[in-house]
């Protein structure tokens, strides 16, 4: 899907949101969807695919006008608006800020906080994490796990009648599934041991590639001189 055009993407996911969209942004792939009588999803297209696909995220200038309209409609309809985007709203990553955080995200933060929107869901990193815009005020952001990434968990979000919310994760028991389906794959049968090591290797390789491709020659030299223990510690920073 990384090489898909905007039109192709909308066609691929037609049965997973677009066909039942309440409203569509004419300038992007953003749309709204009524999850229930009191809950509306604001699905924001933060991807950059024109003229070329980019890793980093951005909300188009024209889309902000559409967002303002949706904020007003949600208030008029008396529904809770839950914004969702692929890229992160806040600086969730320590080393991948440029690739993960939406460009000029403060503009989006200001709009959402003006309307007292309490929560924003995102992915991209897909490392289960949450933070708040400011320590004692502002919007919360939850970076949701990827079900395909160890420890293979999904999020359960509950909105209460008093307009507060709770969120927790639920792990998928891969070892139980493997036994039930009589799998012979040792990695699945011993998933709780295999998964952490596999994920650590992924993060290590990502960190290595980021340093290796750095324009600063000194960065590459530093990596070469790191001990095995230091490199393993680096793989845990994301």
Model-derived features: where do they sit?
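Extracytoplasmic/secreted cell-surface and envelope-processing proteins
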Residues: 52, 92-93, 130-131, 150-152, ...
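Active-site metal-binding loops of divalent metal-dependent hydrolases
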Residues: 46-47, 86-88, 123-126, 145-147, ...
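Composition- and surface-driven signal marking solvent-exposed, interaction-prone regions
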Residues: 55-57, 156, 170
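His/acidic metal-ligating clusters that form di-metal
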Residues: 40-42, 54-140, 224, 238
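Active-site-adjacent helix-turn-beta-strand microarchitecture at beta-sheet edges
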Residues: 2-11, 21-28, 121, 130-133, ...
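A short C-terminal boundary segment appended to hydrolase-like catalytic domains
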Residues: 160-238
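Short strand-connecting beta-turns/loops that link adjacent beta-strands
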Residues: 36-38, 76, 135-136, 149, ...
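Extended active-site neighborhood of metal-dependent phosphoesterases/phosphodiesterases
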Residues: 1-65, 165
